[in-house]
Amino acid sequence: MKKLFEKVDQYIAKLLGVEDPALKSTQKTMKHTTMGFANVTANQGKFLQVLARSVQAKKILELGTLGGYSTIWIARALPLDGQLITLELEQVNADIARKNIIKAGLDPMVDIRVGKAIDLLPILEAEDAGPFDFIFIDADKPPYAEYFEWALKLSRPGTIIVADNVIRDGKVLDKSSKDEKVQGVQRFNKMLAENKQVTATIIQTVGSKDHDGMAIAVVNQATTLPIKGSL
């Protein structure tokens, strides 16, 4: 028997997270990636697309391509002259993603870079690829804090930064956790809370992907005043 949150997830997906043939085809190919169906859900993909549209993003950076499912959702927020750069560790995943992105008709605006994100980010800085209007972090968890620091370097005031999987099924509550992934997001969450360059929050996500969360941050304007009671 399906749980209530699963039924609600499906209800929302049928209303607002409808997959077209390209997304359905991409979803089927995820089983061939190195992480299986670890991609975002349709509802989460639509949520990311809405956020990217809200800032009228023309330049988007994604850390963690996998099979290109989230890439397609987010890239569809771009204007025709927009660009999305996505970083993927595994060549096999990048190859799958490239085929899916071509099928979706987004190949001209999507640039897939293969390698360790922590090595590719300095290259983007050297290329003066930024600033990006929207940044989505969904890569390996241990260096999430470092990814966030790089996201800030490659952003501008008003940039939205989103990081996925920051609750880890509630395991972030365990301060003595020895899990490197949990420790990575714990470091990230603490850094997010303490950083004065952004206004941020974390939203719990409950649905077909069970219990997790997304961090959402907006890079502050230089003149942004602290919210009363936040000091």
Residue ranges and their predicted role:
Residues M1-F136, K141-V162, V166-L231:
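A short alpha-helical cap/connector motif
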